[in-house]
Every structure is written in C-alpha cells, then in structure tokens.
A protein has these predicted regions:
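Aromatic- and glycine-rich beta-strand/loop motifs that create alpha-glucan
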Residues: 1-15
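Residue-level recognition of transmembrane alpha-helices
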Residues: 11-12, 105-106, 186-187
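Secretory targeting signals
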Residues: 18-29, 36-73, 104-170
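Transmembrane helix segments
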Residues: 20-28, 173-206
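Generic transmembrane alpha-helix motif of multi-pass integral membrane proteins
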Residues: 92, 167-177
Length: 206
C-alpha cells in the first residue's frame, strides 16, 4: 500500500536538484571576480565554497531540509492517515495492540526517512566527487579518504536530524489531527535550523 515507487522518484528528483546546487556552489568562486563590488556579502561568501568539506556541509544542510519534509510526509502516510479518522476504527479490529502497530509504523518511518536521505546524498556526492577527479572545479583542495569519511558522517548526522524533525512534526500534527500542519511544521523547523547551521558554519570558517 505504501508508494515506494513514488518515494524513489522523490529521492532521485531531490538528488538531481541537490547535485545541481552542489555544482553551483563549486562554480561560485570562479565567478567571484565578475560579481559587482557593491555586492559585498557575495564577495565575502564566495571563498567559503573553495573547499569540498564546506560544499558537502552546505549541500547536506539543504538535503536535511528536503528530507525533513519528506520524513513528515512519510509519517503522515504511516501514522496520521491510519490513526486518525475512520481508518483508526479499522485498526481496532486487528488482533494486535494499537501501541505495537504504532511503534512498528513509527520505526519503519524513521528507518525509511534516514535511508532515503542517505541514498540521496550517496548519489549526489559519489557523482560530484567522481567528476571532480576528472574535471575539478574546486581549486586548492583534493579528494581524499578523509573527505569521504567526513561527508558520510555529515550525511548520517543530518539524516537523523531530518527524521527527528519529521517525528516531532508528526506528534504536533497528530495532536491537531492535520497532515498539513505536520508538513508546515517540518518545513518551518528545518528552515530555521538550517539557517542557524549556516550561520554557525560561516562563523567557524571566519
């Protein structure tokens, strides 16, 4: 019953979108000299994109926003749709405790959310790093084993955060009995967190 094919399409579409942004990040320093002097902020930020680790961090943050909303949608499909309204009365007829069904569905949603973001990031960074070994856009940095390790850690960390945001949003949406609120809360929360992480990242680099 769960639209796995639709989820895979979302993952591939998101991966294509994030890959495009990743290449854009890598291209920004090359156009720094062409940016009008009046755009001081852009000039200040451009050097940030001169290393792979920062690009990976920014892409992972954006991926977290996308998959926080994805996670909320998965929780909507697995939890809110089944435990609110008429479908809940159907669950009462099952010989299994509702709490057990709820727990299994919640764990499944968490695993699916984390796996989806990890798969997406794997596609994005594998393709990006591979092309960088052939036609490097980032000057002054190199692909290394430690880079893959750091990228993997970032992807895992942010995928867990995205799933946690989806879980929190689901709890709020469950109380309000609204799938729309679940999605809105997940988007708002993830955007707020991403802005805080971006500011923190820039502060560390400075």
């Amino acid at each position: 019953r769960n639209p796995i094919k639709k989820y895979l399409l979302i993952i591939l579409t998101t991966a294509a979108f994030l890959l495009g942004l990743t290449y854009l990040f890598a291209y920004i320093p090359h156009k720094n000299s062409a940016i009008p002097l009046g755009m001081a902020i852009v000039h200040a930020i451009a050097p940030v994109f001169s290393n792979y680790k920062t690009i990976a961090a920014l892409t992972s943050i954006l991926s977290m926003v996308c998959f926080a909303v994805f996670s909320a949608a998965v929780f909507n499909q697995f939890i809110i749709h089944d435990f609110t309204g008429k479908r809940f009365y159907l669950l009462l007829s099952y010989p299994i405790k509702n709490s057990t069904i709820f727990l299994v569905k919640a764990v499944t949603a968490v695993i699916l959310s984390i796996s989806a973001m990890l798969l997406c990031n794997l596609l994005v960074f594998t393709f990006f790093y591979y092309t960088e070994t052939i036609f490097p856009m980032v000057k002054g940095d190199a692909i290394s084993a430690s880079l893959f390790y750091d990228t993997g850690k970032l992807s895992l960390l942010f995928s867990v955060i995205a799933a946690a945001i989806g879980l929190i949003s689901m709890q709020i949406g469950f109380v309000k009995k609204s799938s729309h609120i679940t999605l809105i809360v997940s988007f708002a929360f993830s955007v707020l967190l991403s802005n805080l992480l971006d500011v923190s990242l820039l502060a560390d680099l400075n």
